[in-house]
């Protein structure tokens, strides 16, 4: 396996070959351990040097900086640094087949492609919405229209309470360890020994108990918990801790610099314990305030959302409410950080089942999608993992004669996802048959839709498919990376500047505009009955009627505008001219000069009229009276006279030479 590149550090041994990132990582780790050993040796030498009265003043500064709390904090920091370094090295580690290589027409491989981490910003789950600060305001607006915003606010406050409570408990445990280490009397035989290891072990045990709970970081908007900013308190706690540690070192320096009797040593030790207790009292008070703030936040959340007297209580059972009360008012006087977890699950399920699907179809989510699409940072994952965007992208790829690349990526990614979901419990022969379908279509020498993969990739796919036990879930990883890179580097920039992309945006904007007008009418109907006390009923009704008429007029104008600019393709069909939907029976005849249709063929005399026709004629006579042919002839004569008079006035100089025959 080749290294990712040369080491960024400059050393005198630059001519030596680079050992790779793994060796450089181990070298840094060993160097860090050597520095820690050097610090431990220096601190031990400083503690031993206290016995000599000549060096007491010189080592006074070393004593102030070598307290047990300082060593414990250094140990924690070293562990965190080593963990972060190892994690960074693991993330940067790449197998040999992930090296950058050129794929000809398909471009260069994408080293950052990881299918399990790809997700679209345009399609969200409820958990992603609650943790995303961009889409969360839109979800809050949607829930406010439904008068269910208290569900979202409770979930956010409970999540923030859960995370901050665990951080406060860790800070309280750290302060307790420091107080116990400061208040412990020092024996004459172990007066000059540094209890760094014991403090570190006790701290690890205490923090290990609370590390089982996940520390969730949630950025909630609108939460008003009493004391959520614990950074100033922690800073003050650390400063008090350093002050108490320095007082302890001064006391040790005074008592250890001279040889005094045993009684004097006992009295000085009692004096040191008293001074340490007095110095640790502010630390204890701040720690108590920290724990009281946890209780206060829990009570505030319970009063706002869980109490039966709350303005908008969340939908939970009485048994669950009693369980929350028992966890807040524990027997040991401590608040359980997980007291709201069950209520959170109930609220989450209610939002997901009753509201979230409607939110995804609302104009609020369309507004969020428009914000993402117009932000200027649209990635390929946003397009491929969103159904609506994928539809327009597939049309663009079809116009570019590259739809086979997209179809291969979708099919191969779906195949690998299904195999990975089965976790090794799948039929190898069946999986091999499915993989051979993709191979015959895109990779073989007789492929129906060849994509241009070279022989190296084809041989790799053959070896991955034709293996004992069936193909692995990552058998198409290399061509998937190639197809992903090609779409990302070659086709995505063109799509983002194409007419299809702007059509997609236009469709979203039109849907938002129409839904806003419809939503305005719904909200107006919902709030129209609510009037202010000083307003009369008639005034409120008139105002609501006027507003509704304005809304309807706006909708009518909008619809007319949309209909005016949209050309129906069906209206351009020439065959539609010969379609006479409401035409009756065909008959032969002619049209006179007056526009009268004169039948030339009489109906068959032997055909009897149907009962329906006879009934209609009877009803016509009963309603309109007697309509015989004489009256109809008279009407046509009157019409003829009117037409003749008009013609004579128009052509007064020319006599009427011929008359119109009826």
Swiss-Prot record:
Residues 634-647 are annotated as: PKA-RII subunit binding. GO terms for cellular component: cytosol; mitochondrion; plasma membrane; protein-containing complex. Its main location: mitochondrion. The modification Phosphoserine is found at residues 52, 189, 281. It comes from the Eukaryota. Residues 1-55, 178-205, 242-280 are annotated as: Disordered. Residues 256-280 have a biased composition (Polar residues). It is found in: Mitochondrion; Membrane; Cytoplasm. Keywords: Cytoplasm, Membrane, Mitochondrion, Phosphoprotein, Repeat, Transit peptide. RII-alpha binding site, predicted to form an amphipathic helix, could participate in protein-protein interactions with a complementary surface on the R-subunit dimer. This is A-kinase anchor protein 10, mitochondrial. The lineage of its organism: Eukaryota, Metazoa, Chordata, Craniata, Vertebrata.
């Amino acid at each position: 396996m080749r290294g990712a590149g040369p080491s960024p550090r400059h050393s005198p041994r630059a001519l030596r070959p680079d050992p790779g990132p793994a060796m450089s990582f181990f070298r840094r780790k060993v160097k860090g351990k050597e520095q820690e050993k050097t610090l431990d040796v220096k601190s031990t030498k400083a503690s031993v040097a206290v016995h000599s009265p000549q060096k007491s003043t010189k080592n006074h500064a070393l004593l102030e900086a070598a307290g047990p709390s300082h060593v414990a904090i250094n140990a924690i920091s070293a562990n965190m640094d080593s963990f972060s370094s190892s994690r960074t090295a693991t993330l940067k580690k790449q197998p040999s087949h992930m090296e950058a290589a050129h794929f000809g027409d398909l471009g260069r491989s994408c080293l950052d492609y990881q299918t399990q981490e790809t997700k679209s910003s345009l399609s969200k789950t409820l958990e992603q919405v609650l943790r995303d600060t961009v889409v969360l305001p839109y979800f809050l607006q949607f829930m406010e229209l439904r008068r269910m915003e208290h569900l979202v606010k409770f979930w956010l406050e409970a999540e923030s309470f859960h995370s901050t409570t665990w951080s406060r408990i860790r800070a309280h445990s750290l302060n307790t360890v420091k107080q116990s280490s400061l208040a412990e009397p020092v024996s004459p035989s172990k007066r000059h020994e540094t209890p760094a290891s014991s403090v570190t072990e006790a701290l690890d045990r205490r923090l290990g108990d609370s590390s089982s709970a996940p520390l969730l970081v949630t950025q909630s908007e609108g939460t008003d918990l009493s004391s959520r900013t614990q950074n100033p308190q922690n800073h003050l706690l650390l400063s008090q801790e350093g002050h108490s540690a320095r007082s302890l070192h001064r006391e040790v320096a005074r008592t250890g610099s001279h040889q005094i009797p045993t009684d004097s040593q006992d009295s000085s030790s009692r004096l040191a314990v008293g001074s340490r207790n007095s110095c640790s009292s502010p630390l204890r008070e701040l720690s108590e305030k920290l724990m009281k703030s946890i209780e206060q936040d829990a009570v505030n959340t319970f009063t706002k959302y869980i109490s039966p007297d709350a303005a908008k209580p969340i939908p939970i059972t009485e048994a669950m409410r009693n369980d929350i009360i028992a966890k807040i008012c524990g027997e040991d006087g401590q608040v359980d950080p997980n007291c709201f977890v069950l209520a959170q699950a109930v609220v989450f399920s209610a939002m997901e089942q009753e509201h979230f699907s409607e939110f995804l179809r609302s104009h609020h989510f369309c507004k969020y999608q428009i914000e993402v699409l117009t932000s200027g940072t649209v990635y390929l994952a946003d397009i491929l993992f969103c159904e609506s965007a994928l539809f327009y992208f597939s049309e663009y790829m079809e116009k570019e004669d590259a739809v086979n690349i997209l179809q291969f990526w979708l099919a191969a990614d779906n195949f690998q996802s299904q195999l990975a979901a089965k976790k090794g419990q799948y039929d190898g022969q069946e999986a091999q048959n499915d993989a051979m379908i993709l191979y015959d279509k895109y990779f073989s020498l007789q492929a129906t839709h060849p994509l241009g993969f070279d022989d190296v990739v084809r041989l790799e796919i053959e070896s991955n498919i034709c293996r004992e036990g069936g193909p692995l879930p990552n058998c198409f990883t290399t061509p998937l990376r190639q197809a992903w890179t090609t779409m990302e580097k070659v086709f995505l920039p063109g799509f983002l500047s194409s007419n299809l992309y702007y059509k997609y945006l236009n469709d979203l904007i039109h849907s938002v505009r129409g839904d806003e007008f419809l939503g305005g009418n719904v909200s107006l109907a919902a709030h129209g009955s609510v009037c202010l006390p000083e307003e009369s009923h008639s005034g409120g009704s008139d105002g609501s009627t006027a507003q509704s008429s304005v809304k309807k007029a706006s909708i009518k104008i909008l619809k007319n505008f949309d209909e005016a600019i949209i050309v129906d393709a069906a209206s351009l069909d020439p065959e539609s001219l010969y379609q006479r939907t409401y035409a009756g029976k065909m008959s032969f005849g002619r049209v006179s000069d007056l526009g009268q249709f004169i039948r030339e063929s009489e109906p068959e005399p032997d055909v009897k009229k149907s009962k329906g026709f006879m009934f209609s004629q009877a009803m016509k006579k009963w309603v309109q009276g007697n309509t015989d042919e004489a009256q109809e002839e008279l009407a046509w004569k009157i019409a003829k006279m009117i037409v003749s008079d008009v013609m004579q006035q128009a052509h007064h100089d020319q006599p009427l030479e011929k008359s119109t025959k009826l």
